[in-house]
Amino acid sequence: MTLVLNQTEQLTSGLKAMGVKLAEVQQAKILRYLELLHKWNKAYNLTAVRDPVLHVSRHILDSLAALPYLKGVQFLDVGAGAGLPGIPLSIALPESHWTLLDSNGKKTRFMDQCRMDMGLPNLRVEHTRIEAFSPDVKFDGIISRAFATIGDMIAGCRDLILSETRIYALKGLYPHDEIEAMPADFEVVEWHKLEVPGCDGERHLLIIARSGNTGGS
């Protein structure tokens, strides 16, 4: 079985198991992303997952697991790395707008190449550190699956977090210690245990907001 056929079947069955419906053109873009990731990863070490057969479950389905819980139009992916979860989510939500931020030049060049190659007009890439980032838009949601801790994420993004902004933190095991160490002016307003086909181990999504701003969550 060729790699492309393997990934296509994994993607189709995984989306069905998760109840995520994507048009053929959206699935084609995701498969093209996987092709680019496999190609660039050989030279630039974009992801520690070296086996491309695992990229569908570990990267694509894992990213899309957050899809049912996202609310808003403007999103920021902090520490986007190889474009995860931002690129899969921007493909799945073409009416939304995504800013993908990373301080690693190789990774932002890869994300820019994906944006141009795949035709993703709702995507912009920023090569900078979060502390130096001065956006010209207000974000409804700030998401990350790679930022060190929830506390670090809040500290870095604090100036961007408005009363209505939601932080979406994708984690493995439920991070009890990180939650206990969160700043007092923030709280977990929702949390969800995620089921990701093909992924071993637990996955959780935590939705965090400024304390006292839980309406509409």
Swiss-Prot record:
Its EC number is 2.1.1.170. GO terms for molecular function: rRNA (guanine-N7-)-methyltransferase activity. It is an enzyme of class 2 (transferase). The keyword S-adenosyl-L-methionine applies. Belongs to the methyltransferase superfamily. RNA methyltransferase RsmG family. GO terms for cellular component: cytosol. It comes from Hahella chejuensis (strain KCTC 2396). This is Ribosomal RNA small subunit methyltransferase G.
